[in-house]
């Protein structure tokens, strides 16, 4: 964390929204708005001219939309960008695209009277601006070329892979899921901290680039190899064994580590069923979600992989697992597919 004031550029085509955001940000002693842009073209110019620490970027704007502006900014003046998205299906899809193209994080605009409801998400926005300062913008540019791997002798492994991720997760998942072969012999469960709707867009996006079938997990669905299951937003994702098969269940119990879905919840349930055949992968993200789950996996003799700092947008969740001594392997995201193939 820095002692100096965080300089923020606010990009939004609505003059009213620009003032709401300015009021929220300027109310804090450790941050201030240093400029505004009303469209994507102006955003690129101001990013180069003002060199802000953080940019809040509206998605839907005239002349150049948020995603196009983001791509240009990451090329010309790499900066930490937080997308401000609508809670629509289209908004979710564009947000996932933005996260793949270098945005650090996003917040969702609530429905209803803008000024009142936006103030409800003010604490989240301020927290994400502060968190963004832990990110090196150069990390966001890293895009290794990875070719899809093959398995010559696929076997029924009886194993399961559970991947947990938060801030920066879509980028790291992009280096892992699309590079696994169609005959990967273990089901993969992904718990990514995201609101409802966004997890569906994430699944659709990964499915379009992967040989494995990527989908949101459904209540009562059987867990099978050949699939990557994404935990739906706002539900914990559990697993239960029944008549020799394993099924998912969705759980609305209290948040764990202040999140739902929680990685710990899914790892706990998976480890109880799959025991030593559980492989946990803890990717980029703030906080410690996944650490207790990793302990459970180790308790039953399973394997834990933590993402290396090199490819993490936020080195928090993996760092916690490494510091507790639970990580068997510490690897950059692009080397994880190879290790998973070796382990299954």
Swiss-Prot record:
Q: What is this protein called?
A: Protein-glutamate methylesterase/protein-glutamine glutaminase
The opening ranks of the lineage are:
Bacteria, Thermotogati, Thermotogota, Thermotogae, Thermotogales
**SUPFAM superfamilies according to UniProt:** CheY-like, Methylesterase CheB, C-terminal domain
Q: How is it modified after translation?
A: Phosphorylated by CheA. Phosphorylation of the N-terminal regulatory domain activates the methylesterase activity.
The residues responsible for catalysis, as annotated, are 166, 193, 289
Residue span, Response regulatory domain = 7-124
Residues modified to 4-aspartylphosphate: 58
EC primary class: hydrolase
| GO function term, MF aspect, one | phosphorelay response regulator activity
Q: Which Gene3D superfamilies match?
A: 3.40.50.2300, Methylesterase CheB, C-terminal domain (3.40.50.180)
Superkingdom classification of source: Bacteria
UniProt domain CheB-type methylesterase: residue ranges? 154-344
Q: Which gene encodes it?
A: cheB
What family is it from?
Belongs to the CheB family.
Which InterPro entries does the record cross-reference, listed alphabetically?
CheB-like, CheB_C, CheY-like_superfamily, Sig_transdc_resp-reg_Me-estase, Sig_transdc_resp-reg_receiver
Which species is the source of this protein? Thermotoga maritima (strain ATCC 43589 / DSM 3109 / JCM 10099 / NBRC 100826 / MSB8)
Concerning SMART domains, the annotation shows: REC
Q: Does the keyword Cytoplasm apply?
A: yes
Q: What is known of its domains?
A: Contains a C-terminal catalytic domain, and an N-terminal region which modulates catalytic activity.
User: Where is the protein found, in the record's own terms?
Assistant: Cytoplasm
**Which catalysed reactions does the entry list for this protein?**
[protein]-L-glutamate 5-O-methyl ester + H2O = L-glutamyl-[protein] + methanol + H(+); L-glutaminyl-[protein] + H2O = L-glutamyl-[protein] + NH4(+)
PROSITE patterns recorded = CHEB, RESPONSE_REGULATORY
- Give the E.C. number(s): 3.1.1.61, 3.5.1.44
Q: What GO biological process, any one, is recorded here?
A: chemotaxis
Q: What does this protein do, in the record's words?
A: Involved in chemotaxis. Part of a chemotaxis signal transduction system that modulates chemotaxis in response to various stimuli. Catalyzes the demethylation of specific methylglutamate residues introduced into the chemoreceptors (methyl-accepting chemotaxis proteins or MCP) by CheR. Also mediates the irreversible deamidation of specific glutamine residues to glutamic acid.
- In the UniProt record, which is one GO cellular component term? cytoplasm
Keyword tags? Chemotaxis, Cytoplasm, Hydrolase, Phosphoprotein
**Where are its TM segments located?**
none
């Amino acid at each position: 964390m820095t002692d100096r004031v965080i300089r923020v550029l606010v990009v939004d085509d609505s003059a009213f929204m620009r003032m709401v955001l300015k009021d929220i940000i300027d109310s804090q002693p450790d941050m201030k708005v240093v400029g505004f842009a009303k469209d994507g073209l102006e955003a690129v110019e101001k990013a180069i001219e003002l060199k802000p620490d953080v940019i809040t970027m509206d998605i839907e704007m005239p002349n150049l939309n948020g995603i196009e502006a983001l791509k240009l900014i990451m090329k010309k003046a790499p900066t930490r960008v937080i997308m401000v998205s609508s809670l629509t299906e289209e908004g979710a899809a564009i947000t996932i695209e933005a996260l793949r193209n270098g945005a650090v994080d996003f917040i969702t605009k609530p429905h209803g009277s803008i000024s009142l409801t936006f103030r409800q998400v003010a604490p989240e926005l301020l927290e994400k601006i502060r968190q963004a300062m832990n990110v090196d913008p150069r990390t966001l540019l890293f895009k290794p070329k990875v070719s899809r791997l093959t398995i010559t002798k696929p076997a029924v492994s009886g194993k399961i892979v559970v991947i947990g991720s938060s801030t920066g997760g879509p980028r790291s998942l992009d280096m892992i899921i699309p590079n696994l072969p169609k005959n990967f012999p273990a089901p993969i469960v992904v718990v990514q901290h995201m609101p409802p709707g966004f997890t569906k867009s994430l699944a659709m996006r990964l499915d379009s680039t992967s040989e494995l079938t990527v989908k949101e997990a459904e209540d009562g669905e059987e867990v099978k190899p050949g699939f990557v299951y994404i935990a739906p937003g706002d539900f914990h994702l559990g697993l239960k064994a029944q008549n020799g098969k394993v099924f998912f269940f969705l759980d609305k119990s209290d948040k764990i580590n202040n999140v739902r879905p929680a990685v710990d919840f899914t790892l706990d349930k998976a480890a109880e069923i799959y025991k030593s055949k559980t492989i946990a992968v803890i990717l980029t993200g703030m906080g410690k979600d996944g650490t207790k789950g990793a302990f459970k996996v180790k308790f039953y003799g399973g394997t834990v992989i933590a993402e290396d700092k090199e490819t993490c947008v936020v080195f928090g969740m993996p760092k916690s697992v490494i510091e507790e001594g639970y990580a068997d392997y510490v690897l950059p995201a692009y080397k994880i597919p190879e290790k998973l193939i070796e382990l299954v």
